[in-house]
C-alpha cells in the first residue's frame, strides 16, 4: 500500500500564513471586546464625600484611571469640585486625570473635550485598564456627561453607570423634608 505524501506549494503556505494573521488579529479584537472592563460612570453625589454610594466608592478604589472634570479659573487655576470629593475619599491621586471643560455658552468646545475623552477612555480600556469617568451629583440625571455615555452606547462600547445622590435630594434631606 502506497503512502500519500502531501506537498504544499510556497504560494499556498504564504496564503495560509496571511489567513492565520488575519484570523489572529480578528480574534484579538473579539477578546478585547469581550474580556475588557466596561467603562464606568461613577456619580459622586452632591459634594460631601460621605454621600457617595458604596458601589461608587468600590469602583473608584478599583480604577486604574479616573477621568475627572475640571475648569480653569480666570487666574489660570485648575478648579474641580469632583477632585475635592475624590480627595476626601482617600483615592490615590496618581490615578486621577483631568479633562478641562471650558465654561462657555458655545457647547461645541465642550463636545470636542468629550470627544477627546472618549478616545482616551477607549485607548485605556483597550490596554486592559479599569476606566472610570466621574460626575458630580448623579451622572444620569441632568448631566452633560450623558453626551459621552450615549456615544459609547451608540458604538456598542460596554458601559456601566453607578447612581448617585442628586443635589436636590440631599437638599431635601438637609431641610428635613
Language-model features and meaning:
Residues 11, 28-29, 34:
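Low-complexity, intrinsically disordered or signal/transmembrane-proximal segments
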Residues 9, 19-20:
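Serine residues within intrinsically disordered or low-complexity segments
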Residues 34-49, 54-57, 61-158:
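Class I S-adenosyl-L-methionine
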Residues 36-38, 157-160, 166-177:
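Beta-strand/loop-alpha-helix module characteristic of Rossmann-like adenine-cofactor folds
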Residues 146, 165-166:
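Alpha-helix N-cap/helix-start capping motif
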Amino acid at each position: 500500500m502506497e503512502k500519500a505524501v502531501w506537498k504544499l506549494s510556497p504560494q499556498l503556505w504564504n496564503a495560509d500564513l496571511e489567513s492565520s494573521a488575519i484570523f489572529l488579529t480578528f480574534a484579538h479584537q473579539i477578546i478585547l471586546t469581550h474580556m475588557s472592563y466596561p467603562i464606568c460612570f461613577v456619580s459622586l453625589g452632591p459634594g460631601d464625600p460621605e454621600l457617595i454610594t458604596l458601589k461608587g466608592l468600590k469602583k473608584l478604589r478599583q480604577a486604574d484611571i479616573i477621568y475627572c472634570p475640571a475648569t480653569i479659573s480666570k487666574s489660570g487655576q485648575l478648579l474641580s469640585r469632583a477632585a475635592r470629593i475624590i480627595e476626601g475619599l482617600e483615592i490615590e491621586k496618581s490615578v486621577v486625570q483631568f479633562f478641562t471643560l471650558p465654561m462657555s455658552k458655545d457647547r461645541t468646545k465642550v463636545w470636542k473635550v468629550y470627544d477627546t475623552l472618549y478616545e482616551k477612555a477607549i485607548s485605556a480600556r483597550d490596554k486592559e485598564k479599569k476606566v472610570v469617568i466621574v460626575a458630580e451629583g448623579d451622572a444620569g440625571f441632568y448631566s452633560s456627561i450623558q453626551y459621552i455615555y450615549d456615544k459609547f452606547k451608540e458604538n456598542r462600547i460596554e458601559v456601566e453607570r453607578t447612581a448617585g445622590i442628586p443635589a436636590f435630594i440631599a437638599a431635601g434631606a438637609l431641610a428635613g423634608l
